[in-house]
Amino acid sequence: MLALAAAPLLVCSAATADDALPDANRILDRLEALELRQKALERELAERDARIRELERRARGREATAGRQLEELPVSPNEEPGTTGATRSAYALNAGPRTPPAVDSGSEPSSYGVFQPGGQGFKLVDTPQGDLNFSAWAYVRYLNQQDLDDSYVDAFGRERTIDQRNDFQLNKINLYFKGWLFDPAFRYNFYTWTSNANQGDPASVVIAGNLSYQFSPELDVGMGIGGLPGTRSLRGTFPFWNKVDNRTIADEFFRPSYTSGLWAAGTFENNLNYRVMIGNNLSQVGINADQLDDELNTISGALWWTPQGEYGPAGGYGDFEHHEEPVTTFGVHFTHSREDRQTQPGTEAIENAQLRLSDGTLLFQPGAFATDGQVNRATYRMMAVDGGYKHRGWSLEGEYYWRAMDNFSTVGDVPVNDLFDHGFQLQLGSMLLPRKLQAYAAGSKIFGEYGNPWDLAVGLNWYPNERRLFRVNTEMLYLNDSPVGYASVPFALGGNGMVLHTNVELMF
């Protein structure tokens, strides 16, 4: 009886087990499908992470490229303002492929007519085929040189008159039209550049530009008018200087200048940056093509490292940004050029990177050494090393220069076969009021074969709206036998004594 009673139960249990098997199989199938899908998602996430890392790497390179090309508002025709590869900051104007989107806090984004902060200017056009941006830089200067001696005597006993000045000048104006076309990696930069203190002189107004293409963060190639990167001030740091559009006399004395040529620049993931350029001569401003030789042997290069990954906008001077942690920069530069007296600009040329003796005498002028001889050709070689430190509004920055000139081609009696000079500059800055008021001191000295000139300046920068690109500057400058000087800078050739100048500088 019990067996008969249990039989139906066993039959039901067996049937239930048979029914459960398909369900278990379906669950296993679903688990396997979910496992496969999870693996696919993991692969997709890994690929996406790899793409993000690559985009971040490219973005770092683009910000680096921007500094080499787009934030340096040049003292003479060169490239426009940008952030150096070391900075990777928000100040980059056309950071690589495309100009950053316009910013307008008070309205919806627009494709044109919008002001872009940080020196980017106004976005005039923004289309899938390219964009166009307009920016400008200018400053007004009051200059008083009445405390200078009215004459000086050079190393050969020749007395020369100094034209003391006391005037106002709208000293320089730069107008920029820049952007990209067809391919975001292909960029153009066209500009007009004026030096109103030199009105009437050759090349007081220049219309020029350059073209560039970024193949990768490590390789950006350009051609046109550019600065030979022979010193830090020609490495894309302008206008982020303590001074307003003038260097120490040592930097001015040793440096190369601006010329037409071809360059390559790049930045690497270890925060190492480079720029190398081959050009026509040391300074092409005011020089026509017929005056150039056919050797094309002017070459200049710079290699610099920012261990912390950035050194402020454009890698410039001073710590306006108030770095909470210390940042540093280290660089080395070299320039070589075979110069002809016809390829050197005139004495009062706007950017007269002249080859001079340390008493200010032009190397190529007739009778330079108080003889009947003249140097017609010479080889210029210059090396510079620089370093900088910034922390909490303080900055200390220096540079040392070595320059050799030899292999002279002469006519008549020239008593020397070569020249060697060296020197240094130091700049100390402190933000007395964060983003409002900066004090600085800058000095330099040249150890030369025909004199040891030096200069010392102290100045104040006031930023009325707490923006670095608009400031009022006042500087007291003491000169001792200045070997350099021309109309657009505050120092006078041969100057001895005190100079006062006040500047109002604006860049947008």
What are these regions (language model features)?
Residues L2-V11:
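Bacterial N-terminal signal peptides
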Residues P22-N25, R165, A378:
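Residues at secondary-structure transition points
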Residues R26-D29, T298, V499:
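N-terminal amphipathic/basic helix or basic patch
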Residues F115, R255-P256, A378-T379:
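A short catalytic or substrate-binding loop motif that flags glycine-/basic-rich loops and adjacent residues
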Residues G119-Q284, Q291-Y311, Y317-D340, F420, ...:
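Outer membrane beta-barrel
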Residues A15-Y139, Q146-D149, N271, W305, ...:
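N-terminal periplasmic/intermembrane-space "pro-region" immediately following the signal or transit peptide
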Residues S107, H323-F508:
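Outer-membrane beta-barrel pore domains
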